[in-house]
């Protein structure tokens, strides 16, 4: 039986390798394809790329073989605009080229990236970063503290298109959305060439600010500050990304792969290998690629659950299941007239989360009812996961739910686990009389539909956070996909918790937040998913425990051929 399964995967890989390449396209205007077609083409294209890279034919026998790492992700990135990331797929691309001040580890601690160290003042109103030395931009320009200052001025400019402005909301001189209150008012100043000071509006828990700053990519602000908002919004401005990161952008085939060269002058230690290729590979094809060596690891989404047992049996792979904050959630479009609080509660309690975890995840996860899971120090054990079909039916009837209506249920393609979860949820809802039509689109199209409010329901994943206040990102601003009223009770509780400076003060407030989150149900939180990590044994120095916080540190990996 095992041989048949192995043969099936190898046949899949061979079939994929025979598919032709698609042409490169403009990063902003190319037509998106279905994830399965994209990944099949990507597998073919990058198969030859990886093979050629790993076996680099050389005319001179003394020339060293080029070392290449090929990493996969199951979804397509949006574009190369680092201030407007829409998904973790975008983050995977940007994270190679650009750096942030700090990075979050899986255990909740922070490590410096551009920052060598940091210190908060006694009043917790200022945070001073000392910067590392030897930092250079990929174009050879010297890096300075002023690049950070100008980067944050760009992010806070209301005319600039950015989804990262939200992370500036605690800074002095910015409003609640992170917008500067007047031109250049943001409280970020350089102290010489090697220090930057961040001033807060009021005393703030320092980990909250560090968490936000870990999401902000530093761009070459001193060069970009004089460009207009229109220029900064053009794809050609970012066609050749210039960062300080461990990898230098080389080329891409839109929707299929991005290739990078190692930054041999990287201030945090040059990569051990020469080239990094990030490929879009449908989750159904990931194990085949790992088994035959076409891909070395998966950066987001991990190995599909159905394939993990077989992955663990492969002699060429290292595997690990790691608990994570990452979760899946159901989007309820609160802007729809029928989608009242009572209806949202009913739809949420109609979902059998325990069965989803046991049957779909084979126990590699945990049912949740809020974004705060049991491994989070802020977890409230008194807020129980619900499942009550009879009560769900009763509440729908009491709310006069339009049972004759078919709800559009948007599902992004490329993640087989999520697609299967959506099908099961549709059956759960059918059991309480709710009709759905599943609409499958690629991830960028899904995000566009969700932001416009085209959907009735949607399913999406989040990396989660140990910091409860990050939940506000999905309740206000660009990522308020549920379209809930902005000034809601949940936001008020999060702000209250944020205003407190000790764990002892904050915990009761975030306990109440979880109670209210279940009651208001703007989203139907479903389950956490363990990170099912697999990587080729030729790699060492990989830290699976940090994958859930998107801190891959690829430049620290070692490669043996």
Question: Whereabouts are the PLM-identified features?
Answer:
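Aromatic- and charge-enriched surface segment that lines or borders ligand/interaction sites
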Residues: 116-164
